[in-house]
Structure formats: C-alpha cells, structure tokens
C-alpha cells in the first residue's frame, strides 16, 4: 500500500456567520446534530487534501434537520486500525541549551532562570503586575512564580527534535503537516478555543514521540487528541459523535475511545503542558502592544503548528519570537531592539531569538506547492474576525526579506 493518507475534504467556502466565542455556547447548547452534505466519492489513499470538491449532480443529500447548527461537509479519513506499539524514548541529554532541541534538566532550568532574573533585577525593570492587586483573577502576587513554574514544566514535557526519525514509523513530517492543517479547519468549524488547537498539536507530538503509529491511524490520533483537548479546555466540548461524523464515519466511537485510553496512558495523564498562548499574553502585557500586534503574534505562532521543524523550540521561545517579530514589522521605527524589560519577562535575549525569528520568516516567505495547498491558518487569519492580519502589507515587505537573510540590523 502506498504511503499517504486519504483526502479529508471540508467545505470551507465562505466564512461562518457565527461569531467565535470563548465558550462556543452557540455551537453546542443547541444540540449535537450537524446538517451535512454528502460529498462525491473520493479516491483511496493519497494525500489529505483541503481542496473542496463539488458533489456530482444528482447525488443524494442527507440532511439532519436542525436549524441550530451550520452546515458542515463531511471529510474522509483512513479507516484501518492497528494496535499501538509503544516505543521507549531515547535518553535525553541534560546539558543547558541555547536553541538546541535537547531537553533540559528541571533543576538546571530553575538555577538558570533564577540567575538570569537576579542579573536583571539590577536594571530596575518595571513591575507589570503592581497595578493588578485588586483583580484576584490575575493573581498578581503569584504571577512571577506561576510563569517560572510554566517554564520548568514546558522543559519537562518537551519532545525530542526530529522525533519521527528516532524510531521506526511510517509517519513523515509532511503527513504531520497535512493532519495539522486539516485539524485547523475542524477547530474552526467547531468554534473551539485557541488553547484547544495548540493543546491538540502538543498531545499529538508527545504521543507520536513515544509510540509508533501507522499512517492509516494518524488521523485517528489527530481527532482523538482534539477530543481530549476539547474536554480539557472547553466549557461545552464537542461530543464523540461529532468527531465520528467529521471523519465521515471512518472510525467508530469505540475506536476513538480505545485510542483515547491509549493516548492518556501513553501521556501518563499529563495534559497540562504550557502553551504558546500562555507566554504570549505575558509578553504582550510586558510590551504594552495593541490588538493588531497581539493578533499578528498569534498568527505567527499558529503558522508554526504544522511545521515539523519547529517542534524543537519550546512554547515560550516561539511566543517570544512571535511578539518580537510582530513589533518589528508593525513598529519598525520605534522598535529598534529587544529592550531589557522584554528580555526580563520573556527570559530570552535578542540574540537567542534571532534564529527562531528567521525560521518563522522563512515559513512566511515560502512559496512552494505545500505552503499554497495547505494554508488553512493563512485563510483563517484572513477573515475580519482576525483583523485580516494574514493579508497585511508588512508580511510581504522588504524588511521581512532582510530579516530572513539576517540583515535587519
């Protein structure tokens, strides 16, 4: 059987008329049925395409009558299910890293962060939490300790770089890209929280890093990861029937539950890995950026999700690089350097971030067939909901090309 995965086509023509809300109440409280249009028969194994295919004239439409849900086109998935075979993770080095993918020892992380913070205290950096004492939700007294804990936790839960190459598996970086691109569309249609998408990708990488999965079961891992992430993050998560439906009944409820058990056991029930969004909010607060800069930073973080080469960087590194690049592009005259305040709160120097920033810029400027075909994130951020941020002129400027070449000094 040739390598690849089946088409998973979604009808993405037109923007959803529903506004995106943090609890996705409108998408869940009204009921669980979803109006559908049966697509034309798709070819067997190939790549997971996002190209919309029009149903043949005369094809029957099966519609569940429920006006409370927006119509959604079913998507085709692979159907084979094989046993999950666990593989031990290679021993990971514990030395300190700069932008290397190796995982740090937690004790060394604590010592490095503490020493780094003490050095910057002498610079009399502004306390961005001093005015939040009256708001108990912001936990101003504990904010610094919380983010130090998140930094330690993200290191403990990092996956090895090039983890797909370290074990016998049929999964490739391109297959991962296609899967994540499709999951971005599923996430958009289900009106889920941003955290749910980032956690979904984290769960996929952590599980694949420790278990060998056949290509025929990769999509099952993907939808199960989103099922788990939804229950972890959402107030009203999609039901298991919704995930069966979105894969065109390629997997049964029993199969998703079986994979859910396997993934939870494989992850040792540790789901709370820090996300890029957690660190971006802290960085945006420290920088005092406006909504446009914050939204652009979110877009820059999200385009890294399908990229297998970006797995080597921690969420805090990607978040810091995203806000750095966002401020550089939207405010190049006043943003001449990574100031001590941002160095303090992000815990990364400008020199540390430059290689990561250049990789993000290379993703933005890439113009190959894969980037054009699998562009769900760019399409998503081209909507008015996200300020049409993916279409701004700064993302096609000479400054961006200079940054890619490392000559933006």
From Swiss-Prot:
Keywords: Cell cycle, Cell division, Cyclin, Mitosis. GO terms for molecular function: cyclin-dependent protein serine/threonine kinase regulator activity. The keyword Transmembrane helix does not apply. CDD domains: CYCLIN_CCNB1-like_rpt1, CYCLIN_CCNB1-like_rpt2. GO terms for biological process: cell division; mitotic cell cycle phase transition. Pfam families: Cyclin_C (PF02984), Cyclin_N (PF00134). PROSITE patterns: CYCLINS. Gene3D superfamilies: Cyclin-like (1.10.472.10). Belongs to the cyclin family. Cyclin AB subfamily. Essential for the control of the cell cycle at the G2/M (mitosis) transition. Interacts with the CDK1 protein kinase to form a serine/threonine kinase holoenzyme complex also known as maturation promoting factor (MPF). The cyclin subunit imparts substrate specificity to the complex. This is G2/mitotic-specific cyclin-B. It comes from Arbacia punctulata.
